[in-house]
């Protein structure tokens, strides 16, 4: 096989002066085309091929070594195709065009029983391949033997079979189920990209179809040359969120000027259409005409908005006895006709032909002139009487509390009223009446403010009508305790016993307060509520009160026990003192008795005279 490389290789061309051709490049014309010069054989590896080299046919051809069985007619064509592929292949080893796997395949196939051990494969390489003849020793064979073992382990065409004998190496055989041609490595199965290439090809086709179909519509406005390729990226063809097809952006978004820097920022979030809706009104708001259907729709819309913005008296802390009765809702919408407006002006002196409803829907709520910073109830009643959406704002005497303040009526001063010129006098009269009504309304608001500003000290339970009064003490305590420790209860016991009546409804009536033992319990409740700072139920308060009473009883019992213990100790001390004194007295008496006995014993005997009868 290596005999074909023994031909003479072309040498470097020298000139007459001994210089190589590549050193004369500056002296030659520039239009002369230079062919690549071949280098010396010692300066390159693997060995370069000569220009007219024809690879000889040898028995080590990889087509013969493969385990694929070909028909006799097709074998010649397969060998020619393999040789043509080898000539164009980029793999060139020192021993030829065959790889290690091809050599191992030929070695196993040349055996009689189609199996070889690892040492036999080494031996076959040294004997049959000229390149390995002088590399059989242990020093120079480490590299290529490692490559042999590597290829045996990684290729699917080789199969390892356990040897029957003990202490013998395993057999290596050809796998009959292996695929022909280049075998796939076992550990490199992830590098098999055939499926990925197919999937990628289908994706490219889909992108091209999207470019042809959709990009034309997006690029109607003179696209730049740089946007021809990257325009299709805006469709997101392979996005996981749009697996059904390309995601095309909305036509409401217009494109900016194309840029070479990025294709992602070329879509502007500015809408192509105007943001303002087309109301169909001219710029001049003085002469405004509206249809009845449009006015009714606006009236319903703002009516629901006004209902949502209603301030409930319970939320703002209004009392029921504020002096202003609740007003019913205003009359329903009336069509804005000029004749009907004139009839209403003749019937009621408080009629005002207002502006078109489309431009009064955002007016602020009418509020008392002197109570802008206070929670006045006149604001709620004035809002109920005014309908800012109605074309004809009617202030009927049936709604005496529905007079708007002067600042809300000033909003109509810049609007030209519809009607003939003879209504000027009527307008002056209406303005005077409106001023009078606003003054009376201000007086009512002042009265309400004065009534609400009365001090709490003047509130007397004796004169208060409590015939059908029911009080939920639990809610009262929760509301009072929500002020964060500002509860102060001062209720005389006599007033509680005399003026509070029983009530059958509600979770707890006022009469249950009289069941408390004394004012100290009420003060305990106030102390508990002021310290807690949070809403507690009455049951919890009672439990805490009972707990405090139990603690007090336990403290009293402990004090009594301590006093008894002290008395007992004092009694014991007295007893000890008495015992010591008695023992001292006894010892003293005993000592004195002994002393007397000793004195009597020590005295001399007295000689008495014999009796008279003795002679």
UniProtKB/Swiss-Prot annotation:
The modification Phosphoserine is found at residues 75, 190, 259, 262-263, 268. Residues 63-77, 221-230, 256-265 have a biased composition (Polar residues). Residues 336-351 have a biased composition (Low complexity). Residues 39-77, 182-205, 217-269, 318-359, 389-409 are annotated as: Disordered. GO terms for molecular function: DNA-binding transcription factor activity; DNA-binding transcription factor activity, RNA polymerase II-specific; RNA polymerase II cis-regulatory region sequence-specific DNA binding. It is found in: Cytoplasm; Nucleus. GO terms for cellular component: cytoplasm; nucleus. GO terms for biological process: cell differentiation; glucose homeostasis; negative regulation of cell growth; negative regulation of cell population proliferation; negative regulation of insulin receptor signaling pathway; regulation of DNA-templated transcription; regulation of lipid metabolic process. Pfam families: Forkhead (PF00250). Residues 95-201 bind DNA. InterPro entries: Fork_head_dom, TF_fork_head_CS_2, WH-like_DNA-bd_sf, WH_DNA-bd_sf. Keywords: Activator, Cell cycle, Cytoplasm, Developmental protein, Differentiation, DNA-binding, Growth regulation, Nucleus, Phosphoprotein, Transcription, Transcription regulation. Residues 326-335 have a biased composition (Pro residues). The modification Phosphothreonine is found at residue 44. It comes from the Eukaryota. Interacts with melt. Transcription factor involved in the regulation of the insulin signaling pathway. Consistently activates both the downstream target Thor\d4EBP and the feedback control target InR. Involved in negative regulation of the cell cycle, modulating cell growth and proliferation. In response to cellular stresses, such as nutrient deprivation or increased levels of reactive oxygen species, foxo is activated and inhibits growth through the action of target genes such as Thor. PANTHER family: FORKHEAD BOX PROTEIN O. This is Forkhead box protein O. The lineage of its organism: Eukaryota, Metazoa, Ecdysozoa, Arthropoda, Hexapoda.
């Amino acid at each position: 096989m290596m005999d074909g490389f023994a031909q003479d290789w072309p040498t470097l061309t020298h000139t007459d002066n001994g210089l190589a051709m590549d050193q004369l490049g500056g002296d030659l014309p520039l239009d002369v085309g230079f062919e690549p010069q071949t280098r010396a054989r010692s300066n390159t590896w693997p060995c370069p091929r000569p220009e007219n080299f024809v690879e000889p046919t040898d028995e080590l051809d990889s087509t013969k070594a493969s385990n694929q069985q070909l028909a006799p007619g097709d074998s010649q064509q397969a060998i020619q195709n393999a040789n043509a592929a080898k000539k164009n292949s980029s793999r060139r080893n020192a021993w030829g065009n065959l790889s290690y796997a091809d050599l191992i395949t030929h070695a196993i196939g040349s055996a009689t029983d189609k199996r070889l051990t690892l040492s036999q494969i080494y031996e076959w390489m040294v004997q049959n391949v000229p390149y390995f003849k002088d590399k059989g020793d242990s020093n120079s064979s480490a590299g290529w033997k490692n490559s042999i073992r590597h290829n045996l382990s990684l290729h699917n065409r080789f199969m390892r079979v356990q040897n029957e004998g003990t202490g013998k190496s395993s057999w290596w055989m050809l796998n009959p189920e292996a695929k022909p041609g280049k075998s796939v490595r076992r550990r490199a199965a992830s590098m098999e990209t055939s499926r990925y290439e197919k999937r990628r090809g289908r994706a490219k086709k889909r992108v091209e179809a999207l470019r042809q179909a959709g990009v034309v519509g997006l690029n109607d406005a003179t696209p730049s040359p740089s946007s021809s390729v990257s325009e299709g990226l805006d469709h997101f063809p392979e996005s996981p969120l749009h697996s059904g097809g390309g995601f095309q952006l909305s036509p409401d978004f217009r494109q900016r000027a194309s840029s070479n820097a990025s294709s992602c920022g070329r879509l502007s979030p500015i809408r192509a259409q105007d943001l303002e809706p087309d109301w169909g009104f001219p710029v001049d708001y003085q002469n405004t005409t509206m249809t009845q259907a449009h006015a009714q729709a606006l009236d319903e819309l703002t009516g629901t908005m006004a209902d949502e913005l209603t301030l409930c008296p319970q939320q703002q802390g209004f009392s029921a006895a504020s002096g202003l009765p609740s007003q019913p809702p205003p009359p329903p919408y009336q069509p804005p006709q000029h004749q009907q407006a004139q009839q209403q002006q003749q019937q009621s002196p408080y009629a005002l032909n207002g502006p078109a409803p489309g431009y009064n829907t955002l007016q602020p709520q009418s509020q008392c002139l002197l109570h802008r910073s206070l929670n006045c109830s006149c604001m709620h009643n004035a809002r109920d009487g005014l309908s800012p959406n109605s074309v004809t704002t009617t202030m009927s005497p049936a709604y005496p509390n529905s007079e708007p303040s002067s600042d809300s009526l000033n909003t109509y001063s810049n609007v030209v009223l519809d009607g003939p010129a003879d209504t000027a006098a009527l307008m002056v009269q209406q303005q005077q009446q409106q001023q009078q009504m606003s003054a009376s309304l201000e007086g009512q608001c002042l009265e309400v403010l004065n009534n609400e500003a009365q001090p709490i000290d003047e509130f007397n339970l004796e004169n208060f009508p409590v015939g059908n009064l029911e009080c939920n003490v639990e809610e009262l305590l929760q509301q009072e305790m929500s002020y964060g420790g500002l509860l102060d209860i001062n209720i005389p016991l006599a007033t509680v016993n005399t003026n509070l009546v029983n009530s059958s409804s509600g979770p707890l009536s006022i009469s249950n307060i009289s069941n408390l033992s004394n004012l100290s319990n009420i003060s305990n409740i106030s102390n508990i509520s002021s310290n807690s700072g949070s809403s507690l139920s009455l049951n919890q308060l009672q439990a805490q009160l009972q707990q405090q009473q139990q603690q007090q009883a336990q403290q009293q019992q402990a004090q009594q026990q301590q006093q008894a213990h002290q008395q007992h100790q004092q009694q014991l001390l007295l007893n000890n003192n008495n015992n010591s004194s008695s023992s001292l007295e006894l010892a003293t008496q005993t000592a004195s008795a002994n002393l007397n006995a000793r004195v009597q014993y020590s005295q001399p005997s007295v000689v008495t005279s014999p009796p008279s009868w003795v002679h």
